[in-house]
């Protein structure tokens, strides 16, 4: 998927928490292990590796190692150059696209003054409007929409200046896309077992 995205000039990639975990770990795995370098492997690094493996990292590294070194380098460069947010304007409205949310948010604060981590892990309060203008929308993933919607359905959530598009595909929900120009939504059913109440609760 990443290599397909790299070939498309009309795809703008926004870095997320799983990408950040991958980059953190792969930088260390790429270093040849010697008696000197092994001393630099900290407890934090081992915990980061364990966390990454627990979040799907094992299959990722297996696929990554099957690539040639030039292909690996191209992917790493692509990920490292990714932005943490994008801003799009359409019909006099501003859409701010981030992976997770904006931690330490202040409506007076410029986006380029936040730390990268502020965009990667934070789960917004979807009952709260972040920007005072009704023409500014925060578009997020990361938090499965069944955790947000009152009906707990795996559908895109729109409300209070938020557009949340992570519909829990990996947990049996939907893969979703939202068209900013038209407001239309598009869905593909997950190949996983259907999303259950238990799976939803486990993501809280």
Task: Specify the residue positions occupied by each region the protein language model found.
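Core catalytic region of metal-dependent phosphoesterases/phosphodiesterases
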Residues: 1-44
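Extended hydrophobic/Leu-rich segments
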Residues: 2, 38, 114-115, 204
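Acidic, His/Gly-enriched loop-helix segments that form or flank divalent-metal centers
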Residues: 44, 51-164, 168-174, 180, ...
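A short, highly charged, low-complexity intrinsically disordered segment
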Residues: 191-204
């Amino acid at each position: 998927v990443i290599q397909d995205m790299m070939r498309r000039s009309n795809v703008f990639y926004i870095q997320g928490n799983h990408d950040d975990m991958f980059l953190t770990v792969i930088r260390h795995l790429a270093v040849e292990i010697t008696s000197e370098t092994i001393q630099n492997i900290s407890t934090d690094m081992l915990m980061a590796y364990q966390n990454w493996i627990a979040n799907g990292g094992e299959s990722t590294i297996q696929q990554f190692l099957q690539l040639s070194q030039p292909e690996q380098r191209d992917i790493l460069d692509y990920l490292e150059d990714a932005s943490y947010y994008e801003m799009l304007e359409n019909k006099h409205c501003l859409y701010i696209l981030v992976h997770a949310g904006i931690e330490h948010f202040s409506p007076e604060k410029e986006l380029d003054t936040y730390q990268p981590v502020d965009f990667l892990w934070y789960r917004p309060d979807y009952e709260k409007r972040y920007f005072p203008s009704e023409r500014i929308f925060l578009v997020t993933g990361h938090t499965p929409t069944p955790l947000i919607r009152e009906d707990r359905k795996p559908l895109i959530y729109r409300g209070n200046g938020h557009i949340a598009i992570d519909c829990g595909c990996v947990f049996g929900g939907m893969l979703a896309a939202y068209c900013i120009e038209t407001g239309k939504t598009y869905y593909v059913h997950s190949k996983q077992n259907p999303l259950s109440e238990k799976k939803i609760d486990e993501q809280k």
